[in-house]
Amino acid sequence: SEINGDWNTIALSAD
């Protein structure tokens, strides 16, 4: 996956 794409998923989970 794109780094940004993975970060977005992590951010949503963290939030």
Curated annotation (Swiss-Prot):
Organism: Cavia porcellus (Guinea pig)
Gene Ontology MF terms in the entry: IgE binding; pheromone binding
Subcellular localization: Secreted
Family per record: Belongs to the calycin superfamily. Lipocalin family.
Main localization, broad class: secreted
Coiled coil: none
Keyword vocabulary terms for this entry: Allergen, Pheromone-binding, Secreted, Transport
Protein name as annotated: Major urinary protein
Example of a GO cellular component annotation carried by this entry: extracellular region
Organism classification: Eukaryota, Metazoa, Chordata, Craniata, Vertebrata
Domain of life of the native organism: Eukaryota
Functional summary from the UniProt entry: Binds pheromones that are released from drying urine of males. These pheromones affect the sexual behavior of females.
